[in-house]
Amino acid sequence: SGIFWQRSCNVIEIFGFLEGKTPDHRGRILAMLLQQTDHQAEATHDYIQCLFPLDEPSRSVNGAPVLTELDIDEIKESILAQGNLAKSASWFLGFLERNQHWVTKYDHNHLRITRVIKSLRLLASDKAADEFKDKVFGYLGDDLNLIDPKARSFWNSA
C-alpha cells in the first residue's frame, strides 16, 4: 500500500498502522496510543496525525502522513481500519470529556478536533464525522462561547 512517513530515519506505513499491524515512526502501534494517559496524550504532539491521517500536509507536524487516493480506498474498504478509526474517535472523545483545559479561546486541541472531523469525513463517513462534532459541541454546552468562533467555524466546515 501507498504512503510512507519518513522521520528520524523511521518509516510508517499508514494503512498497516490503521489496521493495527505496523508501528508508527516511534515504534508505537495503534493500540498503544489508545492506552496513553491523558497527560501523555496532551504532552505528545505527533500521534494525532497517525490516528487521523488526511490527504493534505499537517501544518503542525512536518513529515506527517499525507494520504493518496489508493490509501483512502484501502482504508475505506478495511474492516480493521474502520474499526480502529471508530475506536480512536471514541478514545479522543473520552479525552475531551475528561479534560476541560481545551475549553478556552485558543488551544491546540481545537486543531486536533478539526483534524479528527476531517479525517472521519474522508475515511469513514459524514455520519461518523458529524456524530463526533456533535459530541464535541455537546461537551461544551453553555461554555460554547468560550471557544473562538473561528475554531467553531472550522469544526462546522470540516
Residue ranges and their predicted role:
Residues 2-100, 117-120, 127, 135, ...:
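N-terminal leader regions that mediate targeting or early regulatory function
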Residues 95-158:
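Alpha-helical bundle/repeat cores within regulatory domains of eukaryotic proteins
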